Amino acid sequence: MLILLTNDDGIASPGLQALKDALKERHDVVTLAPVKDMSGTAHAISRGEDIKLTRIAEYEVAINGTPTDCVMAGLRMVLRRPPDLLVSGINMGANVAEDLSYSATAGAAWEGALSGIPSMAVSLCGSAAPWHFESAIKVTHMVIRQWLENPLPPGTFLNVNVPNVPEYELKNPKPTRQGLRFNWPPPPVTAAGNPAFWDPTIPTPREEEFQLATDEEALRDGFTSVTALHCLFRHPHATERLKAWSLFR
């Protein structure tokens, strides 16, 4: 199987290199990744700039652009045929809830799905070493095997978040939904009534009631989270309700 591998932490990221080495044992892997850390660039592309491709090694290319640029270059310039799978990761840090709006790890998988390629984003959910890449690699192999046996609908991409624990401590993955994690508190104000500062790292929990656990809830309970997403911004239920508006009569 031919796999296109990318990430948003950059070509030198140990997470990317560990996953590349592991996937190469079972598959043909072509790696295109940013020259530098491009975390938080979401689904952005570079406009008005020349994109330079630098060959680092055989089947490994660094690009002075975003992860989405990497996917586009891989599909349109580097690969001779479409890959069977696109994998973005291993990201060093969680990508859950509204993180997905900003995550370039997920953005690369999103671009793959838009191009008709089964795609997945893989994140190892910790904040400091030691990084247990072997755990994320094990889950990645498991998800790939299941996807081959039970293909998902076109346009689907998966967001996989693995607890940063040793492989022997891993629990079975859980299917999850994207959560909505935070209510942002109002910033403190000065005596003149102006906002003093804004700190997006100080949230308050938002309570929700749904049958399927959220991605963050699964992680909090020590499980790997696997969330199926669609590459198109569409909401069938809302569209049906929209049809009832008098605006369209």
Swiss-Prot record:
InterPro entries: SurE (IPR030048), SurE-like_Pase/nucleotidase (IPR002828), SurE-like_sf (IPR036523). Its EC number is 3.1.3.5. Binds 1 divalent metal cation per subunit. One of its GO terms (cellular component) is cytoplasm. Its cofactor is a divalent metal cation. It holds the Pfam family SurE. It comes from the Bacteria. It is found in: Cytoplasm. It catalyses: a ribonucleoside 5'-phosphate + H2O = a ribonucleoside + phosphate. A divalent metal cation binds at residues 8-9, 39, 91. GO terms for molecular function: 3'-nucleotidase activity; 5'-nucleotidase activity; exopolyphosphatase activity; metal ion binding; nucleotide binding. Keywords: Cytoplasm, Hydrolase, Metal-binding, Nucleotide-binding. Disulfide bonds: none annotated. Belongs to the SurE nucleotidase family. Nucleotidase that shows phosphatase activity on nucleoside 5'-monophosphates. PANTHER family: 5'-NUCLEOTIDASE SURE, 5'_3'-NUCLEOTIDASE SURE. This is 5'-nucleotidase SurE. The gene is surE.
